[in-house]
Amino acid sequence: MKNFKDPTDAEVRRYFPDGWAGDVEDKLTAVGRSARENEAFDFVRKLATYSRDHPALHSGKLMQYLPQDDLYMYFRYDAIGTVMVASNTTDKAAALPTASFSERMAGFTKARNVLTSESLDSLATLQLPAKTAVVLELGK
């Protein structure tokens, strides 16, 4: 959960103990996980469930933009919905003006943060904390 290729990415790809014979731990149950592991597990579950239930994410079109100042933005969309993903890979919070993404954002005036359920009533500028990504379901 915290290894960033230091010195390799082997820790990121390590075996997941899920209760099979010989596993000392069972990370598929909340009892077998730490509070931080439960937080990560719930995060992945929420994203996986959202992806499963929204066709734009698995069968929609992709529109992405070149990263600017280590901020990356892309959209997955279909006739039913549009999902925006914005990522800040820097060590500092950043404000991301969205005017340059008008080709994909035209007509949308609000959004819902998929991870927090927070509503955004303005899409003019996105506030992105350091080292985070947001997943926004756009609305009119």
Labelled PLM ranges:
Residues D18, N113, L138:
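Active-site donor-binding loop signature of nucleotide-sugar glycosyltransferases
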Residues S100-T116:
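Solvent-exposed beta-hairpin/edge-strand motifs
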Residues V83, N113, A133-V135:
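Generic alpha-helical hydrophobic packing signal
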Residues D121-K140:
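C-terminal beta-strand-rich structural cap/linker in extracellular carbohydrate-active enzymes
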Residues M1-M105, L128:
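Loop/helix patches that line or flank the sugar-binding groove of alpha-linked glycan CAZymes
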Residues G60-L62, F108-A111, L136:
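Short glycine-aromatic motifs
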Residues Y77-A79, T116, G139-K140:
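Short, flexible beta-strand-to-coil junctions
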Residues L47, A111, K131:
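A residue-level signal for conserved active-site and pocket-lining positions in enzyme catalytic cores
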